[in-house]
Amino acid sequence: MDIKSKSLEELTDLCDTLRDKILKTVSSNGGHLSSNMGAVELSVAMHYVFDVSKDPFIFDVSHQSYAHKLLTDRWNRFDSLRQFNGISGYTKPSESKFDYFVAGHSSTSISLVVGACKAIKLKGENRLPVAVIGDGAMSAGMAYEALNELGDRKYPCVIILNDNEMSISKPIGALSKYLSQMMAGQFYQKFKARVNQFLSYVPDSAAYMAKRFEEGFRLITPGMFFEELGLEYIGPVDGHDLKELISTFTTAKLMNKPVIVHIQTIKGKGYELAEGPKEKWHGVSPFNLKNGQSVNQANQKSATNIFSELLLNLAKKYENVVGVTAAMPSGTGLNKIIEVFPDRFWDVAIAEQHAVTSMAAMAKEGFKPYIAIYSTFMQRAYDQVIHDCAIMRLPVVFCMDRAGIVGEDGETHQGAFDISFLNAIPNLNLVAPRDEESFKNIMEFSYAFDSPLAIRYPRGNFILNNEYKSQKTALAKGEILENGDGSVAFIGYGNGVGKAVQTAKKLNFKPTIVDLVFAKPLDKELLLQIAKTHNKWYVFSDSAKRGGIGEILAGFLQENLLTNILIKSFEYEDTFIKHGKTSVVEDYLSISAEKISNTF
């Protein structure tokens, strides 16, 4: 969409149209609402001032990219947002040439800017990288690693810091606002350059005094930190004032240096309900536009809610139980526990590495730490799991939510890989509940367990709802849930047990159904017992096939020279799994109970 010829009035009308389109689509499909509603004017101003056909537009996480998608080549397809084979909720180059990079995890944008700047310089091209990063993403260390290099290299670029009042403090008083307005004008930037030129000619003593005055001057402005890093700072700027945004971006574009443009926006702008509790409206399921109520009310407790209740009970029972989450208190259910025990449970912002290492120290001091984290974000703390927890065999418990297919968030968020990359770590044990009762037993076991433990559980509900009596959890002990009538064994892990049960109900024979419970260490005694009478093993797990439960069990058979047993796993093939409803995606991957049953 070409908007460069539009008047300010026409651009304002366009913002209203974009906001209406986003609101109606997200209410129907679900998605990230409040951050995108707040970034409409920002996106329009970016497309008006910069050249999206050549300038890399880089959206951190890309929770703020919906308007950008609509302004490029996806207006007519936007109704398919987050649907299978539809528009992704995140930036995705395979979807559009105007999406510079895949996004989904936080705080990568400034590093991408630095890399793009280096490439542009080496290629001798005239392009200007432009990044949008939220104040929440600025809580992660990677952003500061990139800023550190950027301030030293001085590559021309524009970093738009979208402050929607989730992390960064408000500017101080009228003086700060006045100084920021001055800094946003081209006149001030030219004046500042002339002053610096003048200082190069005056005696050292006078220059020193002038420099000291300038440093003191900056102490009362919000950009002091960035300027001390060697970056130009403009702001704060009203992120909903199109005229001011266009003027500010034009100034930044002409500066030929790294510029931080600090804008302030309102999350949920334009939808009164979403302008209220910010966290509630960040990521939403389909909802009623009139009252904001979710369309799909769950009849069964989610795995997240079960975990939250169980951990709260442990915390009430044992005073040494502590916990942490990395910017996901609501998503992991830790928010309810933080309210009750604010001195023992913490949200440490987007800092998975810090979260793990800090809890390792608490374990060393005699506390029992629980780390509530999404499976996909465990990837960000892999070194800390090995170096700071496993080597010393510290009793840290990793509670990994969103294991398996997470649905509409797609490739960057699927919890497919945790079994594969954690199984290789010595001293780390892997366990998964199949339902609420088994989860309760595992959590009770976890408190007394004296080594690192990783518990994985799905987004939403368990497939099973306590249909089978759960045994007290013991290390490396699985369970036989049903004895079959032949030589076929269905071996499930976690929510995969439910899939095994679903599949068995569709068959004309009765397989033996086994809950592995532990992926590491395995219940070798139970597996050897099954091997005596079952020469066909079918494995069910919501995880990657490479390094997954099937390969773990195949390795067990090989080690024990059980070459007569046929083994086949129903896990994810070696591919990144696209977005869409979980049931639709599983059917596409041929791992739904219906598709699996058709293979027998």
Curated annotation (Swiss-Prot):
Pfam families: DXP_synthase_N, Transket_pyr, Transketolase_C
GO cellular-component term (any): cytosol
Entry's cofactor comment: Binds 1 Mg(2+) ion per subunit.
InterPro entries according to UniProt: Dxylulose-5-P_synthase, THDP-binding, Transketo_C/PFOR_II, Transketolase-like_Pyr-bd, Transketolase_BS, Transketolase_C, Transketolase_CS
Reactions this protein catalyses: D-glyceraldehyde 3-phosphate + pyruvate + H(+) = 1-deoxy-D-xylulose 5-phosphate + CO2
SUPFAM superfamilies membership: Thiamin diphosphate-binding fold (THDP-binding), TK C-terminal domain-like
Listed cofactors: Mg(2+); thiamine diphosphate
EC number: 2.2.1.7
Keywords: Isoprene biosynthesis, Magnesium, Metal-binding, Thiamine biosynthesis, Thiamine pyrophosphate, Transferase
SMART domains per the UniProt record, alphabetical: Transket_pyr
Binding-site positions, thiamine diphosphate: H63, G104, H105, S106, G136, A137, N164, Y271, E352
Coiled coil: none
HAMAP family, alphabetized: DXP_synth (MF_00315)
Family as reported in the entry's similarity comment: Belongs to the transketolase family. DXPS subfamily.
Protein's UniProt name: 1-deoxy-D-xylulose-5-phosphate synthase
Taxonomy of the source species: Bacteria, Pseudomonadati, Campylobacterota, Epsilonproteobacteria, Campylobacterales
